[in-house]
Amino acid sequence: MPRPTRAATSSTRAPKALRTVATNLGGTVACCRAALEGMVEDGQGRILNVATFADLAPLPASSAYSVSKGAARIFTRALIADLSDRFPEIVITDWMPGMLRTQMGIPDGVPPEQAARWGVALALDADPALTGATFEMDREILPQRGLKARLKNLLMMRRRRPRRILP
């Protein structure tokens, strides 16, 4: 089967770009809103949004994808800001499975079966400490800290290690 092709921003028509945004951002918003109805009522739940670093390092000919996935990551952070104080048992996390070995992915990418195991394990982990965490493949991406915080942790011999997903 031929691999899907990408089109340069200059040759992509607006309706096609907007469909990509509707799928990636609109789908994330719609699914989260639908799931939250029951979660807010129960006071607990788990949201795991599938994300990417495409907003930080866009690939050529993928502007709509990069913008929409970046907006979805911002939406995840906005959800956390809206809900975490009132509903600490609703756990919200971003997960980036990596480039997959699929028709749309890359030949030497992550086997989809492995990514599925990581995704299921992370989705089933309802530890409230995971709210706001971002995982890439099977490892947490720790937030960047300023020089002052890094020095303080160094002097106090505290080293935070990224969490791992263990399927």
Identify the meaning behind each predicted range.
Residues I90, D94-W95, R101-N153, P162-R164:
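C-terminal helical subdomain
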Residues C32-R33, R77:
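A short, exposed helix-loop element centered on a Lys and neighboring polar residues
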Residues A8, A34-G43, D82-L83:
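A short helix-coil junction within the Rossmann-fold of NAD(P)-dependent oxidoreductases
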Residues M39-A51, F87-I90, A133:
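Active-site loop of short-chain dehydrogenase/reductase
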Residues R46-A71, T76-R77, A81-D85, M96:
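Catalytic loop of short-chain dehydrogenase/reductase
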Residues T28, G70-T76, M104, P112, ...:
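Conserved N-terminal glycine/acidic-rich loop preference
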Residues M1-L18, A61:
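Conserved mid-core segment of classical short-chain dehydrogenase/reductases
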